[in-house]
Curated annotation (Swiss-Prot):
Organism whose genome encodes this protein: Neorickettsia sennetsu (strain ATCC VR-367 / Miyayama)
Name of the protein this chain belongs to: Probable transcriptional regulatory protein NSE_0641
Signal peptide: none
Keyword annotations: Cytoplasm, DNA-binding, Transcription, Transcription regulation
Region span, Disordered: 1-22
Amino acid sequence: MAGHSQYANIKHRKNAQDAKRARKFTKLRREILVAARSGLPDPEFNPRLRSALANARRFGLPKDKIESAIKSSTDKTEGDYQEVCYMAASSGGMWPSGFAVVVTALTDNKNRTASNVKHILSKSGLVLADVSFMFESFGVFSYPKSTDFDKLMEVALEASALDIKTEKNHFDVYCSRESFAATSLELRKKLGEYEHSGLVWRAKTHQEVPPEVHVRLEKLVDALEEDDDVQRVYTSILTERQSEK
């Protein structure tokens, strides 16, 4: 029976991992679809699509699914997805004072997504609230640590970048959302292809919290990301998981 129990546990973990992978692929495909519709369906002339494709390859989305998503962008019967953003703040003692969350989603049914996200947040001791003053929204481009930092700094300045952050495995170059396309072109022209890029939210100040709060935060992020419509979750508590997105 012990052997059976071990097999059941392994099977359960594998099924959970497979479900998580399938959800991720669905979200990546949707991201490509929306990006392709936002401009030309050619990544050379559509930085947002280029970013979505790089992200898809980074997470292993098969080539046939990538091509299918781009082709489907012209199909009117394929979901009419809209970008939505939800913000929330702590409503009690479960979280430290000033804790805030930003959730971005792509949905074809705003009422469904709003209901699901609000339910998850409420169960976790959070209420919908405008916390935009606690965050900044940027374009970000990631280059490997092997990149010459002096050259990166020089090109970033020429491209009107706002900041460069040194992360564990890469350098992140930040720009305004409005200059995302122009900065992308300048960086690629002078530094070559970046590893990945995107439009992100970043807390102006990150909170330091004890380990038990990090555990609670991981559960919150997991619950939100299990929703098929949710694309990204950003919080005022920095985790390694957030810095890798």
